[in-house]
Regions:
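Aromatic-enriched
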Residues: 1-31
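Thiamine diphosphate
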Residues: 52-147, 160-178
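Glycine- and acidic
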Residues: 17-21, 39-45, 67-70, 92-95, ...
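The feature captures the short pre-catalytic strand/loop hairpin that immediately precedes
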Residues: 148-154
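Mid-sequence acidic-hydrophobic segments that form the walls
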Residues: 2-5, 150, 178
């Protein structure tokens, strides 16, 4: 009865017009787009340790790889995850590891090793809102600086920073080709 009461007394502020097209629309969040990008890129192996907010990518890929082929490895920690991905890449598989800010910090030594040994690797960092582990006061993009400069020495690498969910999909494919 509350809805009828409100409808009779509260003016409508705005209306959402119906869609003009009846074509199907794919509605995704960023992690789902990343997972689809991993599949579309032909990535054969993903290694990761569960970490918020990246974990749902591994859940999606574990199911998808059973259907399309591929291997999803849940490592015992972040360092083991990148080590596993580097080993798979060294053995000739297309591999990536997925993490978030604190995990990226733990992967830095192995990431520097992969760069210096010229072992191809895609690292997907699902950035948390920050500072810290939440959104208490503001947001920042500190993981970008960590991705660019977090390794010791001169470790040149390509860092792609998607601004949209669509770019989350396309940038995984692009990263696989670089």
């Amino acid at each position: 009865h509350g809805a009828a009461f409100a409808a009779a007394r509260v003016p409508v502020a705005w209306q959402v017009p119906p869609r003009s097209s009846q074509e199907p629309v794919l509605v995704l969040n960023g992690n789902q787009a990343l997972g689809l990008g991993v599949l579309a890129s032909g990535m054969e192996m993903v290694a990761m340790y569960p970490i918020t907010p990246a974990t749902s990518v591994s859940h999606y890929l574990a199911r998808a790889f059973q259907t399309v082929g591929g291997y999803m490895h849940q490592a015992e920690d972040e360092i083991a995850a990148i080590g596993f991905a580097i080993g798979a890449s060294y053995a000739g598989k297309t591999a990536c590891t997925i993490t978030s800010g604190p995990g990226l910090a733990l992967k830095t030594e192995f990431l520097g090793y992969a760069v210096m040994a010229e072992i191809p690797l895609v690292v997907i960092n699902v950035q948390r809102g920050g500072p810290s582990t939440g959104l208490p006061t503001k947001v920042e993009q500190g993981d970008l600086l960590a991705a660019l400069y977090g390794q010791p020495g001169d470790t040149p690498k390509v860092v792609l920073a998607p601004a949209t969910i669509e770019e989350c999909f396309h940038f995984v494919i692009l990263a696989r080709k670089l």
